[in-house]
């Protein structure tokens, strides 16, 4: 029986990395969960193994799972395919031009207070600015990156704006000061507004009648 392309990729991944790898399939796509201490070794294997040949990283981003589940998670859901889940994750999307298939690879930064994973720049040089963006927006540190500095926010920006606990109004704002004849920074003057609608529902709301 002929295997589908997805089945072939799954077979090749297990052959290269071991049968007990943390692999999930959803919506016709494979996601490989990798512990942070194996991140560099596994990604290098994905690129160099002839049966995989993921020579291109087309995207890399950070994710903040601070409010994931909103308290509804069940026991055991702190792990994904056997890999320990934490607040911050790094997700890479890989492409094999030779085999015409794709793979999503995710790792979890073990320390929520100082999230850090290894840089993939030696494996795929094109992730340089992707990792800088994840550092800028999420505060994820990529160990070994040769030029890890902000890339989107302004000089002197405080905080990381894509974190779930970053205030929507920010922390500082800038304006032109006519007396100093230059643009200055000052604490944000926007008053936060929280509007909670008052909803009155019947006791039987949503139940079949």
UniProtKB/Swiss-Prot annotation:
Subcellular location: Cell inner membrane
Keyword list, A-Z: Cell inner membrane, Cell membrane, Membrane, NAD, Quinone, Translocase, Transport, Ubiquinone
Catalysed reactions, semicolon-separated: a quinone + NADH + 5 H(+)(in) = a quinol + NAD(+) + 4 H(+)(out)
SUPFAM superfamilies the record matches: Nqo5-like (SSF143243)
Keyword hit for Flavoprotein: no
Lineage top rank: taxon: Bacteria
GO molecular function, one term: NADH:ubiquinone reductase (non-electrogenic) activity
Membrane topology designation: Peripheral membrane protein
EC numbers for this chain: 7.1.1.-
A cellular component term, taken from the record's GO annotations: plasma membrane
Family, similarity comment: Belongs to the complex I 30 kDa subunit family.
NCBIfam families: NuoC_fam, PRK06074.1-1
HAMAP family xrefs: NDH1_NuoC
Protein name in UniProt: NADH-quinone oxidoreductase subunit C
Organism: Bordetella petrii (strain ATCC BAA-461 / DSM 12804 / CCUG 43448)
Gene name of the record: nuoC
């Amino acid at each position: 029986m002929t295997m589908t392309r997805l089945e072939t990729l799954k077979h090749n991944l297990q052959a290269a990395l071991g049968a007990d790898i943390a692999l999930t399939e959803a919506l016709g796509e494979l996601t490989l969960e990798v512990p942070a201490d194996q991140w560099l070794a596994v990604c290098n294997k994905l690129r160099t193994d002839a049966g995989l040949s993921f020579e291109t990283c087309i995207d890399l981003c950070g994710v903040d799972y601070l409010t994931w589940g909103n308290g509804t998670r069940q026991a055991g859901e702190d792990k994904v395919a056997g890999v320990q889940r934490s607040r911050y994750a790094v997700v890479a999307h890989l492409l094999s031009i030779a085999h015409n298939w794709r793979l999503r690879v995710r790792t979890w930064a073990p320390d929520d207070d100082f999230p850090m994973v290894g840089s993939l720049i030696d494996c795929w040089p094109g992730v340089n600015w992707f990792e800088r963006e994840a550092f800028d927006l999420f505060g994820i540190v990529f160990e070994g990156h040769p030029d890890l500095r902000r890339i989107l926010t302004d000089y002197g920006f405080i905080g990381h704006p894509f974190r779930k606990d970053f205030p929507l109004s920010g922390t500082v704002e800038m304006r032109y000061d006519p007396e100093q004849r230059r643009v200055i920074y000052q604490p944000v003057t926007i008053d936060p507004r929280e509007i909670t609608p008052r909803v009155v529902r019947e006791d039987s709301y949503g139940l079949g009648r």
